[in-house]
From Swiss-Prot:
Taxonomic placement: Eukaryota, Viridiplantae, Streptophyta, Embryophyta, Tracheophyta
Composition skew (Basic and acidic residues), residue ranges: 267-284, 325-340, 358-376, 421-436, 695-704, 1184-1204, 1361-1370
Positions with biased composition (Polar residues): 52-61, 170-183, 1389-1398, 1658-1667, 1677-1696
Record-given protein name: Uncharacterized protein At1g21580
Domain of life (superkingdom): Eukaryota
Region (Disordered): 1-113, 151-194, 258-284, 299-376, 419-483, 688-724, 1063-1090, 1184-1211, 1319-1340, 1361-1429, 1658-1696
UniProt biased composition (Low complexity): 96-113
Residues of the signal peptide: none
Protein keywords: Phosphoprotein
Bias type Pro residues, positions: 21-42
Modified residues (Phosphoserine): 378, 708
Length: 1696
């Protein structure tokens, strides 16, 4: 079983590790010693038998090792050795040899138990891996490595239980060596990988966290123990010593640790570890030190040999401790190992020996069984706790056990609490698999309170061992708290171990500790000191102390919430932390699992803030963990961020799992993480609190009641207490659960609920405009604020959190007497309150650091607190999604605190800012959690009143006091009545959700608030306008209704003028005060005024230099949002120039350099990673094209007419992806990400052009999805009007055109000046202006493909539809396009001369004339026709690449004199001019008449190319030859093709002479011709295979343009390109442009594809040897990615 376990572990680990390991693998190649380890391994096989992995896994392990060796190139030579190598990696083989007897003993002694362990582990790991496999390759690497390491310990622990001393020693040793050299290497590789992923947007963290979490869970207990012990012993301590975060990192901040390792490399890691070892018992450490030195220096072989020589090492005692924790080893060895490890860990000698391992042993065994049960479905569960420094494990009722297992066991299994968070995430993912289990988990975990008591006991015990390790350990322990994670519990649990509430606090403390582990060093001492108290968390989170007692519970809830949120940010820096927290949360949360507690949003907020802040780093905390927070924002916000990031990943998993209660709980945790930072120094997260609360409604209530006031009192701890927020959250959840149980009963149980799970929030994606206040400076600086907003944004839509705290606090103060103030403080950390959209989704986004109102009854109350968008009722919340914006500049932002609470005001006011300022001032720490919660916190949290009240009552009182700084909090229940500074909330009115929260001078952007109109849903979005530096999150434009409202509101063109006055909302609907405030702020925008026309979209126009805006609308996915935020932050930082935001579509316009993804990013969970990528891309693009991007927007005013499309027009450099990234879950993350990456490339290449394009793409996707689905239909017109007002055809076109918009360089400008742009300009809303679209004159992007594939609706501009070849943005947007492009890349590109307007979609039948064929494309349908699989590209492509009205497609009469020349076994179509494709010279486009299905009857499958696909290809500028089916189409099929290709409006009429059909080329062809790219996916059967010949759009475009006019005759069309299919069939693709143009004599040669397909490059003329312009290259990259997908099914899978 272990083998299986390990195999999965290794698999993920190796996979990611392998690339990195390969280099290390060279050093590692000292597998020659590994062959010696094989003997130990073989002798150890007994131990593997003990493990149940050696024998059982000899083959598996070998296989795994094969994988591993593949990954680890040095290992491949030894398969047998591989097995030893695996052991070696896992455990120093010398150790194994050393302990062969022990191993045998253990094996003999406990052979069957270990298999159980193994069984458990594999399941656990495999499940987590499955759930987190995404990240498996990235983060999991190191996670896997850690797992392996721990697993090695675990394995040794299992087998080494007999050989207690040796086993642990060996394990430890091996683990270390593995960790040091293997892991370090792996970390060098893996760590690098992790860093890469980290930079990638935390993809690894998100996925990897999931996977890591799972792995940690899987080996969690082992690893919990092992790692805890390792950390405590040598590994943990040395890790801690090397970097404070590491012990914690090991679990939650594993990344940080790994990072250090990667930095230190083997040596550094070894040194660190050795150092740690020195810290830990010397004998083992020394042994390890020398061993590791040898191991590292000589390579693993030597180390193995040495270890083999010295199997005597009693590291196994450590392992025993680990085994105890992991409950793998047998009692004896466990005792020895446990006591020994524990002693080592504590450095206390054998303090815990007898009891520790006795309890541990029992615990370990039971726990393992339990874990197995959970994963392996083994019913055994243990109650493990430390009493008097003794770890006691008691069998617990299996249900509890299951719960523990699931939550604690899995999480604790990977004792890294952060890893636990990962586990949590994995669990979420896995939970999906085991939802029933999850329910059990909830129950069990609730019963785990017992476990918490245990944990408390453990805490006492662990406390001793935990000092260096305490944070990390407690985190792990907490996860395992119920599990038997002694370590984590150590720090905090003690106080609140027993009572449920306490267990909540315990969890909270654990979580806090996790957080602390993030700030490990800082908290380390504190934790040890305060192990008993939440205080110890204070180090990390001021809240801890406050949270003690009830607060602790609250904190636990917060933790839970935090964890829940983890998903959103998990990928980010917070990943590990969140993992840890999540794990704890899982254990604790599950314990506290009270479906009623839905403060899931809270976590989102926290999550988001964490994410956005990269909470990873507390001020003290090491920021290694995720790249985000290296500055280590001080303030709890940091903590939150950490939690958030991890949280985010977890949330992602959670979202996937969507297991009922647990999901919700995790969000709690997230929230708690995010709030708890009040003081930079006290970063202990209060997240535990929320987590704790989460479990019980009553507990929550209690906590709320007691906590809220405490919060106020705690306030002193500036936000020390997240409790209030968490309480409120809990209350909200509670109420929500109770009240909304029917409505949001789901919520409690539902995936959707999991606020933490962005996936579910995706459901509410419309609402989900997260607001993240993010100060771009701050963000880059690791500002809590920035991150928080980002985090919030990314965290699913709960953006309430960040701003929530302040506003919430003030709101709470206003609404609830209770000191929501704390909330306010937290607000800063939980800048955004994400109104959870969708009812069930985390409704309670409220949490802003404790900002729930005291109203317990109102779940929403908590939400109200500040952005606590606590959708008290999820559903209500959903609409309510108000953007909470916290101002970036704490000082600047007077807390608009809706709450009339003086405190809230105070906090909100600059004064709070000041307090915040201290941290904020440096911007490095904008710790939201200042006592005042600082303006940022206050930003708006304006108390969202209770559930119902929330909308009403709170209405976002966020009035930002804007420049005036007067607190405009108008808390009125109707948020409608604008906040005083209406400006903050343009109009709080629900419809206006657009509240701009910008404060002019102050720059406080408090907008937020959704008001009660939440119900109206119309203004889901509360958009905050940020003035100079502050950034305002976009309001999420949720529904059509909102759209209309926004329409009206959108009137709110927030005109930013340089004048200091804040944004001026031109919104007609905006209340006067808004108007006034707006005026105040309107000047705020440094660069000209920006109008928000977009109705629904809540784009924030950022003005000032650095602020970033994240569209609030970002998909509910947390991750994505978080990524976006991070990107924004990065962009902001990099391009500090003023960036005008174009409000359009939820896109945030970043000031100059920064870019923001549209808020609209699709909510679909799948998008989360892609979004992140997008954002990163945006960031890159911004940086690269800072100037370029200035898009007319920078100096002048930029209006976004696109309603849904949230394109951000950055002022100069920033680029924003459209908010409209498709909601659809169909778009796979990868696709989106790829698209985004493509966008990145494109952006870089055509910075401005692409940048717009990317936005357009995103817009298109989202708009397509959102607008088409909801906006387009009802709100479409509204949006349209609003958005497109200048253009005249707004949304209808928008949806279609969205993608087109971004495509050209001009498009950026177009976005900015969509109205004015002529010719190719595409309006921001994605409709191409076509030739000059005067105010929407003539060119109506007529085709709006309903949010389905065509974002690219081609618009026939004026007379002809011109599709400007967009780089690939739309392609990017459309996964299909992407994949297509990738495929095309693989195939020779037919350069297509684009003389046809690229806007023509590939709709042959639908579009016969130049008018944009409005072919009905199913957005998610890859295949236009069921028979034509090739049209899989159709789905997401916004084909309407900017219609260049400039070029008209000359009508081409294709003569269908199709002569086939037989070459080889296939007929090749003679490139006759009659050939449609040839005549056009755009074989791909001609052939790729996606819409008109080109059927190759001869092949029996239709070659269908989606018009959409073609359009997007055109847009992409790449024409992929449509791969005809294996047999060249017969004349009949050709005629079909020609028919299909009928030139739209006769522009490029291709007629086959045979058919003499002068059918207008389908616009798709036209487009492809215009764009110079045609995708010719030919479906071999259902597979949509693109010829993969990418026509270089740019070049082809030019060629076509040149050629088409003259050469678009049948002769040109005649030219066909044949692609050899897998089936050994040649597909004829007619090159539209290759024939006529003699520029490049088309080579009829075939290019051999990787798939053994010949692609004929008939279009080479124009292609110029397939030289691709940058666009084409970008497209190629996308195409390569696409082409990698072998079949349309793949496309559809990813794209649908």
């Amino acid at each position: 079983m272990d083998s299986s376990h390990y195999n999965p572990t290794y698999d993920p680990w190796n996979s990611p590790y392998s690339p990195h390991l390969h280099p290390p693998s060279a050093p590692l190649p000292p597998p020659p010693p590994l062959p010696p380890p094989p003997p130990p391994r073989q002798s150890h096989p007994e131990s593997p038998n003990l493990y149940g992995r050696s024998t059982q896994s000899n083959g598996q392990r070998q296989d795994y090792l094969h994988q591993y060796s593949h990954h680890r190139q040095d290992l491949p030579p030894n398969t047998v050795v591989n097995q030893p190598t695996s052991n070696y990696y896992q455990h120093p083989p010398p150790l194994q040899q050393q302990h062969q007897p022990l191993s045998l003993q253990q094996q003999q002694q406990h052979p069957q138990y270990i298999p159980q362990q193994v069984s458990y582990e594999p399941q656990r790991i495999s499940q987590p891996l499955t759930s987190s496999i995404q990240c498996t390759e990235s983060q999991s690497d190191w996670v896997g490595f850690n797992e392996k390491r721990l697993d090695s310990w675990t394995v040794d622990s299992g087998p080494g239980r007999s050989r207690v001393d040796d086993g642990p020693s060996r394990n430890y040793q091996y683990d270390y060596s593995r960790n040091s050299s293997g892991v370090n290497r792996g970390l060098d590789g893996s760590s690098r990988s992790r860093d890469e992923f980290r930079s990638l947007g935390y993809a690894r963290k998100e996925s990897g966290v999931t996977r890591t979490e799972g792995n940690y869970q899987a080996r969690g207990q082992l690893k919990s123990e092992s790692d805890r012990y390792v950390r405590g012993l040598g590994d943990g301590n040395r890790v801690l010593s090397s970097s404070v975060g590491y012990g914690s990192d090991r679990y939650g901040l594993t990344v940080s640790r790994d990072v250090t390792r990667s930095s230190a490399s083997r040596e550094g890691a070894r040194e660190t570890r050795n150092e740690g070892r020195t810290l830990y018992p010397e004998k083992k450490d020394d042994y390890y030190h020398s061993e590791i030195e040898q191991y590292f220096d000589r390579g693993r072989r030597e180390a193995s040999n040495e270890l083999n020589r010295t199997p005597r090492k009693q590291v196994q005692k450590k392992s025993a401790l680990l085994r105890l924790e992991t409950p793998r080893s047998y009692k004896n060895s466990r005792e020895n190992e446990w006591s020994r490890q524990h002693n080592h860990h504590n450095g206390n000698g054998k303090r815990f020996n007898s009891n520790s391992y006795r309890g541990k042993e029992h615990l370990g065994h039971s726990d393992r069984g339990l874990v197995e049960k959970q994963r392996g479905r083994s019913p055994v569960d243990l109650d493990i706790s430390f009493k008097s420094n003794v770890l006691v494990a008691k069998p617990v009722a299996s249900p509890t056990s299951a719960g523990i297992r699931s939550g604690a066991s899995v999480t604790p299994r990977s004792i890294k609490a952060r890893r636990a968070l990962l586990s949590d995430k994995n669990e979420k993912v896995s939970v999906t698999e085991r939802n029933g289990k999850l329910g059990t988990h909830l129950s069990d975990e609730i019963s785990v309170s017992e476990g918490f008591r245990r944990s408390t006991r453990q805490t006492t015990a662990s406390k001793n061992e935990k000092e260096p390790d305490s944070h990390s350990t407690p985190s792990s322990s907490d996860s395992g708290g119920k599990l038997n994670k002694v370590r984590f519990v150590n720090g905090v649990v003690q106080d609140s171990k027993v009572k449920l509430t306490d267990s909540g606090p315990e969890a909270s403390t654990h979580d806090t500790e996790k957080i602390s582990s993030f700030c490990e060093t800082l908290i380390e001492a504190k934790d040890d000191i305060n192990v008993k108290h939440g205080i110890n968390t204070e180090a990390c989170s001021t809240e801890e102390g406050v949270i003690d007692g009830n607060q602790s519970t609250l904190k636990s809830h917060e933790d839970v919430l935090d964890r829940t949120s983890t998903d959103c940010n998990a990928g980010e820096a917070l990943l590990p932390k969140v993992m840890e927290m999540d794990e704890i949360l899982k254990t604790k949360t599950t314990i506290n699992t009270s479906p009623g507690k839905l403060p899931v949003s809270w976590p989102t907020v926290a999550d988001l803030s964490g994410c956005s802040e990269d909470m990873d780093c507390d001020e003290d905390m090491d920021c290694d963990e995720d790249m985000d927070c290296i500055p280590s924002r001080n303030i709890p916000m940091m903590e939150v961020n950490t939690g958030f990031e991890e949280r985010k990943s977890i949330n992602s998993s959670d979202g996937s799992l969507g297991y009922g209660g647990k999901d919700f709980q995790k969000p709690y945790l997230d929230a708690s993480i995010y709030f708890n930072r009040e003081d930079p120094g006290d970063k202990v997260l209060a997240k535990s609190d929320i987590g704790g609360i989460e479990d019980d409604n009553k507990r929550i209530d209690k906590n709320v009641d007691s906590l809220s006031p405490e919060n106020d009192s705690s306030r002193g701890r500036p936000m020390g207490l997240d409790s209030p927020a968490s309480l409120d959250i809990a209350n909200v959840s509670l109420d929500l659960a109770n009240s909304n149980n029917s409505a949001s009963g789901d919520l409690a149980n539902a995936n959707s609920f999991t606020v933490g799970t962005y996936m579910n929030p995706m459901v509410t994606s419309p609402d989900k405009s997260v607001v993240f206040q993010m100060e771009s400076k701050n963000l880059p600086h690791c500002k809590n604020t920035v991150n928080a907003p980002v985090e919030n944004v990314s965290g699913k839509g709960y953006m309430e959190t960040t701003p929530l705290n302040v506003a919430a606090e003030t709101a709470d103060n206003m609404d609830s007497e209770e000191g929501k103030q704390t909330c306010v403080n937290d607000t800063s950390s939980s800048l955004t309150k994400v109104g959870v959209k969708g009812s069930s989704n985390v409704l309670s986004v409220e949490r802003t650091g404790g900002c729930s109102h005291s109203d317990e009854s109102d779940l929403a109350m908590a939400v109200p607190s500040e952005g606590c968008m606590e959708n008290v009722s999820t559903e209500r919340l959903v609409p309510d999604e108000e953007l909470i914006l916290k101002s970036y500049h704490p000082a600047e932002i007077p807390c608009v605190d809706s709450g009339s609470d003086s405190r809230g005001l105070k906090t909100c006011l600059l004064e709070p800012n000041v307090s915040l300022s201290k941290d904020l001032t440096d911007c490095a720490r904008e710790s939201l959690v200042e006592q005042d919660v600082s303006q940022r916190s206050a930003i708006f949290c304006d108390k969202l009143p209770s559930l119902s009240a929330f909308v009403t009552e709170t209405t976002l009182a966020i009035g930002i006091n804007g420049m005036s700084g007067n607190e405009t909090v108008t808390d009125t229940e109707s948020g409608l009545h604008e906040i005083q500074p209406c400006t903050t909330v343009c109009k709080l009115s629900p419809e206006d959700r657009f509240g701009y929260g910008s404060s002019g001078a102050i720059g406080s952007v408090r907008s937020l608030s959704i008001d009660k109109n939440l119900e109206k849903d119309s203004s889901k979005v509360s958009s905050c306008l940020v003035s100079d530096n502050s950034v305002s999150p976009c309001h999420i434009s949720p529904l059509v209704a909102v759209n209309e409202e926004i329409q009206n509101k959108i009137s709110v063109k927030a005109n930013y003028s340089n004048s200091q006055d804040g944004i001026k909302h031109k919104e007609d609907n905006c209340t006067e005060s808004v108007e006034v405030e707006t005026h105040e702020e309107k000047a705020k925008l440094p660069g000209g005024t920006s109008k928000y026309r977009t109705p629904v979209t809540n784009i924030t126009a950022g003005s000032g230099g650095d602020s970033l805006f994240l569209c609030d609308s970002l998909s509910s996915s947390r991750r994505r949002i978080r990524s976006e935020v991070h990107v924004s932050a990065v962009v902001d930082e990099t391009s500090k120039g003023e960036e005008k935001s174009k409000p359009s579509g939820g896109i945030v316009a970043v000031r100059r350099d920064s870019v923001f993804p549209c808020d609209s990013l699709s909510s679909s969970p799948r998008l989360s990673r892609p979004l992140r990528s997008e954002i990163h891309v945006a960031s890159m693009v911004d940086e690269t094209s800072k100037s370029i991007e200035k898009i007319e927007s920078s100096g002048g005013t930029s209006e976004h007419r696109t309603p849904e499309t949230d394109i951000v027009a950055g002022s100069r450099d920033s680029v924003f992806p459209c908010n409209s990234l498709s909601n659809s879950q169909r778009l796979s993350f990868r696709q989106l990400r790829s698209e985004i990456h493509v966008a990145n490339m494109v952006d870089e290449t055509n910075r401005v052009k692409e940048s717009q394009n990317g936005d357009s793409l995103l817009d298109t996707l989202q708009e397509q999805i959102m607008t088409s689905h909801e906006l387009t239909q009802p709100g479409s017109s509204a949006h349209c009007d609003l958005v497109m007002k200048p253009m005249g055809d707004p949304i209808a076109k928008l949806t279609d055109i969205t993608s087109d918009v971004g495509s050209q360089e001009k498009d950026l400008r177009n976005i900015a000046k969509t109205d004015t742009f002529d010719g190719e300009a595409v309006s921001s809303d994605g409709q191409v202006s076509g030739t000059e679209i005067p105010g929407g004159s003539g060119v109506r992007v007529s085709r709006s493909y309903s949010h389905a594939d065509v974002k690219f609706a081609l618009t026939h501009v004026k007379e002809h539809v011109v599709s400007v070849p967009h780089r690939d943005p739309q392609s990017k947007t459309s996964m299909n396009s992407k994949y297509e492009i990738e495929k095309r890349k693989k195939k020779p590109n037919y350069s297509t001369q684009k003389s046809y307007p690229s806007s023509l979609p590939y709709v042959s039948d639908t579009k016969k004339d130049a008018n944009p064929p409005i072919h009905i494309t199913k957005r998610h349908t890859w295949h236009r026709k069921s028979d034509a699989s090739p049209s899989s590209f159709v789905a997401a492509k916004p084909l309407s690449s900017t219609l260049s009205t400039q070029q008209k497609f000359p009508k081409v009469t294709a003569q269908s004199n199709n002569s086939y020349v037989r070459k080889g076994n296939s007929l090749l179509r003679k490139p006759s001019h009659g050939s449609p494709g040839a005549a056009l010279g755009i074989p791909p486009s001609a052939i790729q008449l996606n819409h008109f299905t080109v059927e190759d009857k001869s092949t029996g499958s239709s070659n269908m190319v989606d018009v959409d696909n073609a359009s997007s290809l055109v847009k992409t500028g790449e024409i992929a030859t449509l791969e005809r089916q294996s047999k060249p189409p017969s004349d009949s099929s050709t005629s079909k093709l020609s028919n299909a290709i009928a030139t739209s409006s006769g522009k490029c009429a291709l007629s086959y002479s045979t058919d003499h059909l002068t059918t207008g080329l389908p616009e798709s062809i036209m487009d492809s011709a215009t764009s110079g790219e045609a995708n010719f996916p030919h479906s071999g059967g259902d597979t949509l295979k693109t010829s993969d010949t990418l026509i270089q759009t740019g070049y082809a475009s030019d060629c076509q343009q040149k050629r088409n006019p003259s050469d678009l005759d049948s002769s040109n069309l005649k030219r066909m390109v044949y692609v050899k299919r897998k089936a050994n069939q040649l597909v004829a693709a007619s090159d539209i442009h290759d024939v006529s143009q003699n520029q490049i004599p088309s080579s009829d040669g075939y290019f051999k594809r990787s798939k053994n397909q010949l692609v004929r490059n008939s279009e080479s003329r124009c292609n110029q040897s397939i030289s691709l312009p940058d666009d084409a290259l970008d497209t190629r990259s996308a195409a390569n990615m696409v082409s990698e997908r072998p079949s349309s099914s793949a496309f559809s899978d990813s794209g649908m």
